[in-house]
Amino acid sequence: MPQPSVSGMDPPFGDAFRSHTFSEQTLMSTDLLANSSDPDFMYELDREMNYQQNPRDNFLSLEDCKDIENLETFTDVLDNEDALTSNWEQWDTYCEDLTKYTKLTSCDIWGTKEVDYLGLDDFSSPYQDEEVISKTPTLAQLNSEDSQSVSDSLYYPDSLFSVKQNPLPPSSFPSKKITNRAAAPVCSSKTLQAEVPSSDCVQKASKPTSSTQIMVKTNMYHNEKVNFHVECKDYVKKAKVKINPVQQGRPLLSQVHIDAAKENTCYCGAVAKRQERRGVEPHQGRGTPALPFKETQELLLSPLTQDSPGLVATAESGSLSASTSVSDSSQKKEEHNYSLFVSDNMREQPTKYSPEDDEDDEDEFDDEDHDEGFGSEHELSENEEEEEEEEDYEDDRDDDISDTFSEPGYENDSVEDLKEMTSISSRKRGKRRYFWEYSEQLTPSQQERILRPSEWNRDTLPSNMYQKNGLHHGKYAVKKSRRTDVEDLTPNPKKLLQIGNELRKLNKVISDLTPVSELPLTARPRSRKEKNKLASRACRLKKKAQYEANKVKLWGLNTEYDNLLFVINSIKQDIVNRVQNPREEREPSMGQKLEILIKDTLGLPVAGQTSEFVNQVLGKTAEGNPTGGLVGLRIPASKV
């Protein structure tokens, strides 16, 4: 049958009929159809199709053939084939009618219903025969992969592909293995096997490829390129698709391969077109698909390499990303653990508090709270607004105990004992809080549970985060701040004294303001705004004061640490000398020597009494000593 004239057609159809490249268009899944709003969605790839009348025309593509005489062997054999044109005439008639009255880009006669895609509308489909319509697969059949076995695949009837048993003698192709260019498989979550015609000349492929097509290209007759096309059966042929089980004679893949590829999704169209554009090259020997992961390669390629001589290579090996092995969650864990005081199972359990501690907290909240100046100077709140501003710091505890919580090496038997120590120390101090004591509202004891050494395991071992000279100071990482001297740990007692003076002035200003309740309604919002500004400035100053006070504490603790080490080393040396020279006079006993060393070397205690130490430094600074009595401290002239 002659091809339809393309002279009067629109350019899209003219190009399609002039082109001999068959575009692999697969049977779209109903999910794609349902999600597509464009009525021409299924037929966009039709622009590149060549509507061929006879399936035998698909065997040879004459584009790359330079010598037509080389094809006489094939044409002589193919002339003996019966021409099956009944179905194809109907298809060509449909295409002619469609192109004669409509354009592909604006097919108004095709609606957006699913029945229109199946060719079942009542006015435009060429298939109105009840017998043909009865053979049309339903949507349930098209989506029946979930109920089918993995080896089930879409199998097309023999009427669409008819080849005589021995059209080509085996002697015509000595030592040449020719496999069909299988169509791109139907989109499915199951593994589909490529159908191979049961002809003697076309041998089954034993070479897996890393794409959705099985392509073996050979050089024949003096390296002349001949592209063999077995009929592509993956276009949308309305009302002619049947779902049949695979023939028993076809070998199946091993169970390991099937299970591994059970959830794979096949590529459609695009990968096949990409494969076609590659150069036609001869492949010799066995090819191994390049899989993305080593585990997947071992799992899927081992059965193929062992049993592949008699198997049909499947076409899903290039789309295995969905079934790659998921790495174990334990492998993702870091070797070093930063949660030294928190275990994984403890995070799920809420921290338990004893009711006695809650009662103590309530009692402390009921007590009147106030700031302390230098030692004995008390600044009592004189109005309600200042008390509201002080409510943010009701949960404050002695800094000595809170420092104990934050020390990484601190160990105790229970959180209750630590809370008891906190409450006792708070009672001893009479709930007095110094101006430089600022709480972050949540102490580490309320956030996390301290682990005993017996509870340590490989996941809670200390890491380099807790080294003394590491990048991090203490348990928590250094937070980003706007202060440029955030890493400078040199104390500046004079700056701390100035902050204290500013805080006293601010408290005086806030206390002198008229209470909001005594102001008229129109003036209350402005008064509240001004007081909030003053309170915010006081809050910022308290943070700075706490930072400066912590630097003073750190300096004092380091000095005391060095002095204690000196005392210990000195007394150890005395003990060694006493043991080595027992005949020497023992006028001062070892206990007396130790007391003398402590008295001469150690000054006032710092550890456990950091608040008193800071107040002593502030007192000396107020008297005119810029260093505040800190040993070894040198204040730059710019900061004096």
Swiss-Prot record:
The keyword Transcription applies. CDD domains: bZIP_AUREO-like. Residues 372-381 have a biased composition (Basic and acidic residues). Residues 356-371, 382-402 have a biased composition (Acidic residues). Residues 522-585 form the bZIP domain. Residues 524-533 are annotated as: Basic motif. PROSITE patterns: BZIP_BASIC. The keyword DNA repair does not apply. GO terms for biological process: maternal behavior; negative regulation of endoplasmic reticulum unfolded protein response; negative regulation of nuclear receptor-mediated glucocorticoid signaling pathway; negative regulation of transcription by RNA polymerase II; positive regulation of prolactin signaling pathway; positive regulation of protein catabolic process; response to endoplasmic reticulum stress; response to unfolded protein. It is found in: Nucleus. Keywords: Nucleus, Repressor, Stress response, Transcription, Transcription regulation, Transport, Unfolded protein response. Highly expressed in intestin, testis, heart and kidney, weakly in brain adipose, colon, liver, lung and skeletal. Residues 308-414 are annotated as: Disordered. Residues 317-329 have a biased composition (Low complexity). GO terms for molecular function: DNA-binding transcription activator activity, RNA polymerase II-specific; RNA polymerase II transcription regulatory region sequence-specific DNA binding. One of its GO terms (cellular component) is cytoplasm. Belongs to the bZIP family. CREBRF subfamily. Interacts (via leucine-zipper domain) with CREB3 (via leucine-zipper domain); the interaction promotes CREB3 degradation. Acts as a negative regulator of the endoplasmic reticulum stress response or unfolded protein response (UPR). Represses the transcriptional activity of CREB3 during the UPR. Recruits CREB3 into nuclear foci. This is CREB3 regulatory factor. It comes from Mus musculus (Mouse). The lineage of its organism: Eukaryota, Metazoa, Chordata, Craniata, Vertebrata. The gene is Crebrf.
